[in-house]
């Protein structure tokens, strides 16, 4: 799928994430389109921070945020997802785009 088609299908206007080479086309598109813009695109220090930023965006606007990351960062989102996205707590909706590292049969670095 082309990045432009993905962006159109998501119908979102706020993205936050940790850049990943597997998601380079998406990262390049976001930088070209928004740069670093607190209203549309924030690069955070780790994936858990991204979830917190995205949750704040949703609370302020009511819109669905998008978080992008590589799968090695999933452990960093456990606490914010369990506390902020849980339907019995804040029930914040969020879209995740997660790159897949460590695919069987493919040589790949665990992180970069």
Residue ranges and their predicted role:
Residues 1-112:
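Thiamine diphosphate
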